[in-house]
Amino acid sequence: MSCIFFTGGAEVAETVYFLPKDNVDIAKNPDRDYLIVGFSQPIPEEYIEALQPDLVYLPNYVDGDTMAVEKAAYLAFTRLQWDLRNKYGINVALYDGYRTVADQQWLIESGLATYTTGQPGYSEHHTGLLLDIIVEVGEYYYSELAVLTDESVPEEVKSSTAFNTLHEILPDYGFIIRYPKGKESYTGIAYNPSEIRFVGSKEVAHAIMDNNLCLEEYISTLTP
């Protein structure tokens, strides 16, 4: 996506907040939660086939186009979204989730890919667990990556505490920053705080985030 920040009115569709019941179970699926896809690790074809019944389709909050997210990841995101709004006064929205291999090819061919975009078949967006999020600061929704890299972003946005608050509570909902700073040698992807990854449980997410690990490092600790 070429846009890096978005207006708060005309361009961002109205967010529909959903509060799940407390007893809704988020099933843990290690084969899915710990799957790594990257430049040397393609998405298994059997994974894509098995994922299809577990995709939730919803409007993209930026332009209203249909997007998809793995259902457990989406349920966890709605809880995160609700609490951010009602406890902290912070609005967040999704603007990308699951991508097919064809979607990834189109991004590259259309010139909309960024330097963090993987090749078709080698993007963790194919898992449905990697979410691109934007945060409302003032009149606009911003990608945090844009805040860090675009000189035109106002200073008051760069100094907003909304992004830090988001980072602090992500693990409570089973999310991590997928491509953290200083972990490029492990992930193969440049730092991108706008992409969060569902890992199935808050315990795992805290083990990763609290110890300044990336997903690759954490998984290596599970291997004898």
Residue ranges and their predicted role:
Residues 2-97, 101-224:
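Extracytoplasmic cell-surface/polysaccharide-interacting catalytic and binding patches
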